[in-house]
């Protein structure tokens, strides 16, 4: 019987599996703890699925990493697990090992009272069949720096004595907290970042560290950019991986900052949430290439516990919900959700299994709960079945759509 357990010692094996899975074009470089065990690489918990429980079995069939995080959902912070580095060597593929690894991972999350699992998929179809589904869109805008000159024109009258751009280092990460908190309150699934995450995942990069510049107004950070400059002389791109602005003026200042690189770069690439109005404020939106892609995927770990911990609008409701979960037996069944005074109670029941008010899969329920998909959208796309329109109306009241954005990569 397969054994799921931590990988405390076989870090060279984890390194080999991960290198082959995600960067095969570079070969598999020899494991060097000084190079491959930097602080960024040691965050999270490594796990492996082994053929046996034998202690001398040093060759897992597949591996993964769990990041123990917290994310904001409907105004409250909930324990969230980032699932990453899922890798299987060719000789063990298509034997059901990853399915077992995912099932064991969810069981471990449940033991730790984790409410949501988030991952960045190599293929959406693959993880969708196991119950994860898209949590948000990611919008990438690309243009020549000159296209952003409108922002410089708009900010020319700003008080130079009260505004300044300042380059920050990892030791300055606390200066960004207030601006990031504004961002976190705006978007569902935004992470609660501790100092270690700021240092090693925001200020620290895989092969090189990004630049981090803050826009300060009256001695307070009103916005910031995390970016790299890629390419060779004459073909450089300023690539922004994180853009946070507390208000419209701060957004214009950040765009103007990018425009001011027109002597250094030929293109500017901005990665941002879908509601950041870059095309709306641009003077020449037709000169901006905009691409919308699916972001990470989210999954509820335990339906009954999660429904009981969420905050709801101040209303009363009683719904029977049938959930299909291909991976966990504790979620595959019927639940009664009772809401009163903004709090809910979700209990697993059997009496309503044949006559629920609502029927949907765990992936669709996850999207509904975090706010990415509305009940009406899920019904319209065949992802949710309801006995009548009142059930849809109740779900719409309990789970109104919200802006969601989980931009942290791992």
Regions found by a protein language model. Give the residues of each.
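Conserved active-site alpha-helix within GNAT-family acetyltransferase domains
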Residues: 114-115, 121-140, 275-291
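Conserved acetyl-CoA pyrophosphate-binding loop and the N-cap/start of the following alpha-helix
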Residues: 92-101, 249-253
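A conserved beta-turn-beta hairpin within the catalytic core of GNAT-like acetyltransferases
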Residues: 71-82, 93, 112, 232-239
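Intrinsically disordered, low-complexity, positively biased terminal segments
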Residues: 2-15, 164-410
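A short, internal acetyl-CoA/4′-phosphopantetheine-binding micro-motif in the GNAT/acyltransferase core
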Residues: 83-93, 239-248
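Conserved GNAT acetyl-CoA-binding A-motif
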Residues: 102, 109-121, 263-273
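Conserved beta-strand in the GNAT
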Residues: 48, 55-69, 82, 87, ...
